[in-house]
Amino acid sequence: MDKKIKLAIIGFGNMGTGHTANIMDGKCPEVDLVAICDINPKRIEFGKEKYPDANITYFTDAIEMLDSGMIDSCLVAVPHYDHTKYSIECMNRGIHVMCEKPAGVYTKQVREMIAESEKHPEVVFGMMFNQRTNPVYRKMHELVHSGKYGEIRRTNWLITNWYRSQAYYNSSDWRATWAGEGGGVLLNQCPHQLDLWQWICGMPVKVQSKIKYGKWHDIEVDDDVTTFVEYENGATGVFITTTGDGKGTNRFEVQMDGAKLVVEDDKLTVTEFEVKESEFTKTNTEVFGSIKTHNLEIEIEKTNPQHIGVINAWAGKILHGTPLIAEGAEGLKGVILSNAMHLSDFLGREIELPFDEDLYYEELMKRVATSKKKENVTATFADTNGTYGGAKL
């Protein structure tokens, strides 16, 4: 019998349920799901009813499960504040860990998690950045980093197809609260795009944001964000997102010295310049001269494995030493971006990176202190397929 990892899942909510379904459907052939933990007894009963013949042991205490000796790997899919807590508990026991996005709520706790992982090199630590498996973004990353088109001039990402109604925010007592979730659209939906943005374009050095909290919904946290950034080479970028647009847009544009790259409607368009702009502007003699361009035919892989691909790559790393989709330490960069965006709006000014992480934590805790606990909320769970807001094939 081929060797498999012995997996546990902590958190049997929307994401944990989705991962379980993929594994039980046989889409992760090197994964044996042996344990599931959730503090809600109703979720345990749901699992037993859904998979009555499965050899899965259920727990309501995560530490008891981690100490059971049954598992060698764990997928952490709990509310955001506890991502680092349970990932560290896994590392301390030599258990391989896959952390759902975001890596944490604030950078200080993510740095602690990464520092702990460095003490345990035997542990395979991965991040659930499933959009890195999307072939259009992988190709965009390849082209931007090839050096063929020179430096980035400008980046723009309009990612407003994250629409959520009030029912979504009412589905859990922790959701969309400072104390329970630690943020809104930036921390819940946009970790995917913030990761891709920095993965493809690099990290900015300055951030300035205008954020609205509960603009479109009855919530405490952000549901409308406009951010301006500057990069070390002088390039600029804009990032706009919301969960309030009834019909949103997902358009990511990177303007370079020698080309323009756009991802929209699940397609990558590359407009190549016959002469780089930096050369053309110096040598052109026509008053209204313009650069000649042509569109490239870009061959894109047809497979887009998303969460399944991330889990299979993680199992492959554990069993065979093959590469991960995203190392665990990669989770820090997106949290830096979301924290910087929040801090800019909290203080009403531009933020330079690296920023004062203690100050961010203080500002966050002010909001946690006044966060209102939701009363009489019945947890509601739903199929998350098709809700990820990224390009799909």
Sequence positions of predicted segments:
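Predominantly a Rossmann-like dinucleotide-binding segment in NAD(P)-dependent oxidoreductases
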Residues: 11, 123, 131-219, 348
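Contiguous beta-strand/loop segments that form the cofactor/metal-binding neighborhood of enzyme cores
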Residues: 188, 194-277, 301-320, 324, ...
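Beta-strand-loop-alpha-helix segment that lines the small-molecule cofactor/substrate pocket
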Residues: 66-68, 73, 79-132, 147
